[in-house]
């Protein structure tokens, strides 16, 4: 059956299932092997990859985030993935840490940060959603984005990383007040 981002079931324990000793670890490693194989083909042609695993890991709309996974398990999972790719000699990836914004503090932003040796770019994913039609403009999104970008910029300087906006956009209601349209 089809499901959306957040209505596909209970994913609690997913990290433990795919980390070493978990029932799906072999399957996870097989996926990592596929990623590494493709990365090597790109590497042969000196093509870098900006890799953003487990993005928006502070939200609950993916199995790897929010209420489905503790902060510690989220960190372990990210670290494990990077370590496995490095063990497979993948050296053309720039790794991006990109939780969903907005953020109120550096502590808020860094809650699931896997550590400097696992990340090259510090980023944010953040969207502006309008829940009415026609949309009523508000500058709150831009104020929140500015504050979040300042936080990320400051963290990036402290950790000698690049700062970026990795995903953003605007969602508006359709005239029939159904799902978001672009």
Each predicted region: which residue ranges?
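Aromatic-lined carbohydrate-recognition surfaces of secreted/lumenal glycan-active proteins
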Residues: 52-54, 78, 82-107, 160-173
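Substrate-binding cleft of extracellular glycoside hydrolase catalytic domains
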Residues: 1-92
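Short, glycine/charged-enriched secondary-structure capping and boundary segments
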Residues: 65-66, 138, 178-180
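Glycoside hydrolase catalytic-domain groove-lining segments
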Residues: 106-175
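Long, well-ordered alpha-helical scaffolding segments within enzyme catalytic domains
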Residues: 31-34, 70-86, 144-159, 176, ...
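A Trp-anchored, charged/polar loop motif used as the substrate-binding/catalytic surface
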Residues: 26-38, 98-108, 145-148
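Short linear motifs at secondary-structure transitions and domain/linker junctions
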Residues: 25-26, 71-73, 96-101, 137-141
């Amino acid at each position: 059956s089809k499901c959306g981002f957040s209505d596909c079931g209970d994913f609690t324990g997913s990290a433990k299932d795919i980390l070493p000793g978990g029932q799906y670890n072999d399957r996870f490693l097989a996926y990592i092997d596929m990623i590494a194989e493709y990365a090597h083909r790109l590497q042969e042609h000196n093509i870098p990859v900006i890799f953003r695993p487990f993005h928006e890991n502070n939200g609950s709309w993916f199995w790897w985030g929010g209420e489905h996974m503790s902060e510690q398990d989220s960190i372990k999972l990210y670290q494990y993935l990077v370590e496995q790719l490095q063990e497979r000699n993948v050296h053309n990836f720039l790794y991006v840490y990109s939780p969903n914004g907005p953020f109120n503090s550096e502590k808020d932003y860094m809650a699931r940060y896997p550590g400097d040796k696992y990340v090259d770019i510090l980023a944010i994913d953040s969207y502006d959603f309008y829940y009415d039609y026609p949309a009523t403009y508000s500058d709150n999104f831009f104020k929140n984005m500015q504050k979040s970008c300042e936080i990320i910029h400051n963290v990036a300087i402290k950790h000698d990383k690049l700062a970026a906006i990795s995903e953003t956009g605007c969602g508006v209601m359709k005239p029939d007040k159904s799902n978001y349209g672009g």
